Amino acid sequence: GPEARPAWGDYAQDSIRVFDQPAIVGHAVRATLLATGIAAAAYENGNADYIATAKRWWDDMAGKKLFVTGGVGAVHFDEKFGHDYYLPTDAYLETCAAVGVGFFSQAMNQLTGDAKYMDEFERALYNNVLAGVAASGRQYTYQNPLNTDRSERWEWHPCPCCPPMFLKIVSA
């Protein structure tokens, strides 16, 4: 209707109908959480469009956009997925996006029963999510690049998504 917000394009996965999107795009946290919901709905409803979209997006993410640490979201601007095979050492790799990889992978394992999805869950958890929190549990990193010139952690952040996302995944 007239009160609807304008489309935000690939950033918000609303440039075209979700089921018509050939690849996972846009803001990495948004996209992985949306993909998690699609896979969970596919498990519940068995709808072929949901199943095909979840598999296509996961294959695209795991095959072309996933870092060795299980991180996603290479582009600093908009904290988003880059183009295929864009995997720079100074990539953004937001901690919450790795949590999204974990959730998406877990939902795909539930949907298909294939253990390969849990391999990626473990990769994201052990190499990115856990790296995003200090051993004390009191400090966090918002991003986890492969190569950095600093190792700062913060107790709070203006965008405080990491602490609750961390708690969500360790309780999964």
Task: Label the model's feature ranges.
Residues 1-172:
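Glycan-recognition and catalytic cores of secretory/periplasmic carbohydrate-active enzymes
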